[in-house]
Amino acid sequence: MLVAQSFSAINPGPTAELYLGDIKSVMLTQEQIQARIAELGAQIGHDYRDRSPASDQDLLLVTVLKGAVIFVTDLARAIPLPTQFEFMAVSSYGSSMSSSGVVRILKDLDRDIHDRNVLIVEDVVDSGLTLSWLLRNLATRRPQSLQVCTLLRKPDALRANVDITYVGFDIPNDFVVGYGLDYDERYRDLPYIGMLDPRVYQQ
């Protein structure tokens, strides 16, 4: 398992001209993200290379829409093994800023995952409540293995004990956007991960 990289302070950096003024500072640059994804892909490839010998047993990457779509695409290209994609859409009751852990499925998987090696790919784990529910739900479908890879984890926000095998970065409990992460469906297209200026979501 790769050791997650902790960031104790926000690293200021240039912001793209998109959404000028909305991004308070840059936490992770595009270069940092891509370098870490390359490391994660290599480690996942090493760990799974003897688990998926048959073409119909390619590593199955399960992603919850929409935040991790960019991450899972880049991660799949960094894994030196054949991979397949599956997507779920879930709604977690709670405020726009936090999850209650009460989840309903809006879109389920399109195939049976029985006896498959499944890797859940997340953009960010904060409370861990939704992920904890998802792990329990998918475990009932009897995959051969079930593990988690997340780009970001917020240790200070965790409220559920979830086992995460692959962590890109441990970050402070700040509101971040970019590289797939959004606020009100905006900012997903930023190439970096930045702190959103509080004035944007406190209006």
UniProtKB/Swiss-Prot annotation:
InterPro entries: HGPRT, Hxn_phspho_trans, PRibTrfase_dom, PRTase-like
Stated role: Purine salvage pathway enzyme that catalyzes the transfer of the ribosyl-5-phosphate group from 5-phospho-alpha-D-ribose 1-diphosphate (PRPP) to the N9 position of the 6-oxopurines hypoxanthine and guanine to form the corresponding ribonucleotides IMP (inosine 5'-monophosphate) and GMP (guanosine 5'-monophosphate), with the release of PPi.
Molecular function via GO: guanine phosphoribosyltransferase activity; hypoxanthine phosphoribosyltransferase activity; magnesium ion binding; nucleotide binding
Organism: Mycobacterium leprae (strain TN)
GO cellular component: cytosol
Example GO BP: IMP salvage
Record key words, sorted: Cytoplasm, Glycosyltransferase, Magnesium, Metal-binding, Nucleotide-binding, Purine salvage, Transferase
Active-site residues per Swiss-Prot or TrEMBL entry: 126
EC number assigned by the record: 2.4.2.8
Keyword Magnesium attributed: yes
Assigned protein family: Belongs to the purine/pyrimidine phosphoribosyltransferase family.
PROSITE patterns xref list: PUR_PYR_PR_TRANSFER (PS00103)
CDD domains: PRTases_typeI (cd06223)
Disulfide bonds: none
Coiled coil stretches, renumbered: none
Pathway noted in the entry: Purine metabolism; IMP biosynthesis via salvage pathway; IMP from hypoxanthine: step 1/1; Purine metabolism; GMP biosynthesis via salvage pathway; GMP from guanine: step 1/1
Annotated residues for binding of Mg(2+): 122-123
Cofactor(s) the protein requires to work: Mg(2+)
Protein name in the entry: Hypoxanthine-guanine phosphoribosyltransferase
Gene: hpt
Residues holding diphosphate: 66-67, 188
Catalytic activity, as annotated: IMP + diphosphate = hypoxanthine + 5-phospho-alpha-D-ribose 1-diphosphate; GMP + diphosphate = guanine + 5-phospho-alpha-D-ribose 1-diphosphate
Binding site for GMP: 154, 175-176, 182
SUPFAM superfamilies xref list: PRTase-like (SSF53271)
Record's subcellular location: Cytoplasm
Keyword Glycosyltransferase: yes
